[in-house]
A protein has these predicted regions:
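Short strand-turn motif at the edge of the Rossmann-like AdoMet-binding core
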Residues: 111, 146-150
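Conserved beta-strand signature within the Rossmann-like core of class I S-adenosyl-L-methionine
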Residues: 139-147
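Glycine/threonine-rich flexible loop motifs
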Residues: 116-124
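A short glycine-rich, Lys/Arg-flanked "PGG" loop and its adjoining helix->strand segment in the class I
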Residues: 125-139
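A short acidic, Gly/Pro-enriched loop at the edge of an enzyme's catalytic core
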Residues: 96-105
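Conserved Class I S-adenosyl-L-methionine
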Residues: 128-131, 154-175
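SAM cofactor-binding core of SAM-dependent methyltransferases
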Residues: 33-92
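SAM/dcSAM-binding transferase cores
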Residues: 1-31, 167-224
Length: 224
């Protein structure tokens, strides 16, 4: 697993796990307020946020090496310094590496819906692991989600609506700042329906009843 910043690339073994929030701020030029994007793909939205809000910190998680490297190259070329990009499996990183309750906003756009029933265990959102995503939010933080796979979107809606301390609303139409990802722009052009959700955290994040280690075990059961 690779940790990339404006200053260079590192191995995950170079850092304590879970990553301390102060350590993240040090990696991103002293940033205070944080946003995280899980599965940032080619990095269109993540880079835009970095450039638009240079005093905030942005953490991106992406498993595909080509996409992570593309974002890193573009961010360095634009001389953005307020970001950290982690290359690795999102469920593992959320359960074992990322701090809890640190993000003012979390973004999950068009995650793989794994439509075949035998692959559902690989989904980012399911009853065992929804708290890994929701648990990233600080009190008052917001989670933004979009998918074109409507059945999966309905499942995510139900999971978030039933999660303690979250208030969930459906978004009608585009985000206020327009399409946020390449997929979203493409699907809008094709006229494909998109389900968008916004959830607000009213309290500190919950956690798996048995704690972080149980959440990690649930993650690896999904991969088995």
């Amino acid at each position: 697993m690779i940790v990339s910043t404006a200053a260079g690339d590192y191995g995950l073994a170079d850092f304590a796990a879970p990553l301390p929030l102060a350590g993240l701020a040090g990696l991103a030029g002293g940033a205070g307020r944080w946003e995280v994007e899980i599965g940032f793909g080619k990095g269109r939205y993540l880079l835009r946020r970095c450039l638009d809000s240079p005093l905030d910190g942005f953490l991106g998680v992406e498993q595909v090496a080509e996409y992570q490297e593309r974002f890193v190259a573009r961010a360095r070329r634009r001389r953005a310094r307020n970001w950290v990009a982690l290359r690795g499996e999102a469920l593992y990183l959320m359960s074992a590496v990322l701090p809890r309750g640190f993000a003012a906003a979390a973004h999950v756009y068009f995650p793989d819906p794994w439509p075949k029933s035998r692959h559902h265990k690989r989904r980012l959102f399911d009853p065992e692991t929804v708290d890994l995503v929701a648990g990233l939010l600080a009190p008052g933080g917001r989670l933004f989600f979009a998918t074109d796979f409507l059945a999966y979107g309905e499942l995510v809606w139900e999971l978030l609506a039933g999660y303690p301390g979250l208030t969930v609303t459906r978004r009608d139409g585009l985000w206020d700042d327009g399409p946020r990802t390449n997929y979203e722009a493409k699907y809008i052009a094709l006229g494909r329906p998109i389900l968008r959700l916004e959830a607000s955290a009213e309290a500190p994040p919950a956690l798996h009843p048995l704690g972080r280690e149980a959440a990690l075990a649930a993650t690896w059961r999904k991969k088995a």
